[in-house]
Amino acid sequence: MKKALLTALLALALPAVAAEKELLNASYDIARELFARYNALYEKEHPDAPKIKQSHAGSSKQATAILQGLKADVVTFNQVTDVEILASKGKLLPENWRERLPHNSSPYYSTTAFLVRKGNPKHIENWGDLAKEGVSIVFPNPKTSGNGRYTYLGALGYAQDTFKTEAEQHAYLKDLLAHVAVFDTGGRGATTSFVERKIGDVLITFESEVNGIRQEYGAADYEVVVPKISILSEFPVAWLDKNTEAKGTTDAAKDYLQYLYSEPAQRLLAENYYRVRDEKVQAEYKERFPDVQLKTVEDIGGSWEQVMKEHFANGGLLDQLQKR
C-alpha cells in the first residue's frame, strides 16, 4: 500500500519537474524559422539546458498576451516599447532592463527593405517610388506590429530628408498609406498576402524576411531592394524576472539570451540575414549586407515614447492620415 502510494505521488510530481525544465520564448511573428535554428544550436551546445518552447505573433500582440497571463520566461521582440510596457505596466522586469546585456540588450539588428516581383516591373528603387501611381504595397499594420511601425517610421525618415515642410512630409505619408493593399496584423501575414495570395507589387518588411522569402520561394521570382536610406531596427531581448523567479528558470533564461552574443550564434544570425554586433562575423558576411544610411527612431521622432504617442496612439497621426 505504501509502495503504491509512493509511486502515485512520484507520478504526480513528474509533470511539475518536467515543467521546470522548459523555457518559453515569446517572440515576434517572422522569427519562427530563426529561433527554430537558434534553439537547435543552443540545445546542441547546452545538452542539459531546459527544453525551449516558442510563441510567435506580432510583437505588440505578444506583449499584450504576456500582460494577460502568458508565462513567458524570455522575450525576443522587435521593438523596445513592447518590452518597456512589461516593465512599467506588468512589473515583470526592472526598468533598467536594457543595461543588463550588451548593445542595449539588442544582440542583432536589421533594417527595412523591399521585396519586388521578378524584373522589378514597377521600377522600385527608393521610398519615393512606393507612392507612385499604379504601385500597390503590402506591410503589417503599425497598430499591431513593430515591423509595421518601422516601415512607417522609415517612410517618415525619407520624407523628412526629402521634403522641407511638415505639410509636405505628411502629404507623402498620406499618399503612401493610400497605396496599401492590405494591412495584416503581423509580418508573416503580410508575407503570406504578398507571396501566396499574390497581393501587391511590393512587400515592405525586414531585410532578413525579404531574403528569407527569396531562399524559400525561389530567387528567380523575386528581387530585393534595399533603399540607400532606411531605419535601424533593433531587436531587444530580456528575461522576465517575475516569471522566471516563480518558475526557477532565471539562470537558464539569462544563459539562453547571453548565448545570442556568442560567435556561433552571431554567425547563425548573419546566415539568416540579420546584421550582427560581432565584428569578426560582420567581416565574414559583409557581402550580404548593402551599405545603408541607418536612421534611428530617435533621429526621426525624438524617442519611442514620443513616437508612440504622436503617431500610433488612437487619434494619432497614423489615424489622421488614413482618413479619406
What residues fall within each predicted segment?
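Positively charged n-region of N-terminal signal peptides that target proteins for export
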Residues: 1-4
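A conserved helix-loop-strand patch within extracytoplasmic ligand-binding domains
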Residues: 87-161
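Early extracytoplasmic/lumenal segment of secretory-pathway proteins
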Residues: 18-89, 100-101, 206
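Alpha-to-beta junction loops
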Residues: 69-75, 134-136, 197-202
